[in-house]
Amino acid sequence: MHERNRRLLPQVFALLLFGCMSSQAASASADAAPVSAGAQLPDVILISLDTTRADHLSLYGYPLPTSPNLARFADRAVVFQKARTVVPLTGPSHASLFTSLYPHQHGLFRNGIPIREDIPTLAGMLAQQGYDTAAFVSGWTLKRKICGLDSGFRVYDEGFTQRYKFLNQERPAEEVTRAVADFLASGSYRRPLFLFIHYFDPHAPYRRHSVQWEELFDAAARIGWDIDKEVLAYDNEVAYMDHHLGSLLEILGSQGLMSNAIVWILGDHGESLGEHDYWGHGRRVYEQTLHVPMVLYAPGKMPDHAEIGELASTLDVLPTTLGLLGISPPPGHPLEGRDLSGYLASGKPLPAGRQYFETFKGTWRKFTRILAPEVPDEPSLLGCYEGHIKYILEADSNHIEIYDISVDTSETENLASQMGSGFSDAELLSWFHKGRSLEPVTVDLSTEDVNQLKSLGYIN
């Protein structure tokens, strides 16, 4: 595919590979351990900003005003400066968010396959505690039939509009916010409420919003920045989303849902905008696609404002939420993330440790061959963070890249030939295989589903 068309079709091919958990996890009950009777549980609100890279938000120092509403919200919240996703794809990253498992553990490697019903999710855990649960999604990859993440939700609102005729069905932020507002105004819910809201706008193809476009263009001109129009188009979508995020936060406040609440706002993955000669996400694991915004608001449980400089992961969201609620995870459910609630409340530094990531890249033929049992279904790219050192292994070629991201945020100087590796490729692959127990299965998709996945770049 020609590189100049890459923003219109991200360079991601679909691997329809679905797996099951190990027998211990698969047999585990979805019932989370109950809290004490009469406990006043707060509402839980999780807002996902699809395809949103941290360094293109004004909250994280970007010179253009792409996220003023998120920045205002963050003034009274905990801001994670170094949050990372574990996989740069929408379906797998959200499955990891809702299960605190890596893709090779929950089995949702690629967009287009639903997660197993017997894997406990955050929605199911909260429903077991008496929460009402409602989700509002805006991208085809999170459609219930595609991802299966509707499990545990009483309401799973996925009303899409055909923005580009028969292709790229999605809901713009304005419509998502309106749907949430209508739901809350109807009063057809009970408290405590778990509310999941998903914005998809920064995902390619980017469309132009005149108000935000002019504001950003003028801001760039004022600082003498001749900004690339494709980059401006991405920023324009981020700013449009932020505008409606501001409206959403006002609506939540007017409904009394912010006074006793746990609110997460975070990105599921980022977007490469030409760095490393790549546009899109899914086929690279550089910082542009892994470094995401993550903000936590929990009045009375967290400091009024704090900035966390240690490494954090989207896998930490589920266990931290349960920790804030005083809920134990289901027996046998192997959470990979950490409960950060005690560290955040006390102001202690977050614990150090390795954090892993993975993705596939390559051709559709290669991915389909992976479905055959005689072909090892290993990721093409995997790696880990250890402190400020980042390791990347290209499994096909055993090529290793090592970066010191504390001084080389653009990952331009590979240190593999200059320093001893803190891991071996065998060690990384051992970690991968130790946690997996996958059985390839097939899933029937409608012609419409296939066309939508093609339009989003997930099937060649």
Map each language-model feature to its residues:
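Bacterial N-terminal signal peptides
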Residues: 10-21
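Catalytic domains that recognize anionic headgroups
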Residues: 19-460
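Bacterial N-terminal signal peptides that target proteins for export
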Residues: 2-12
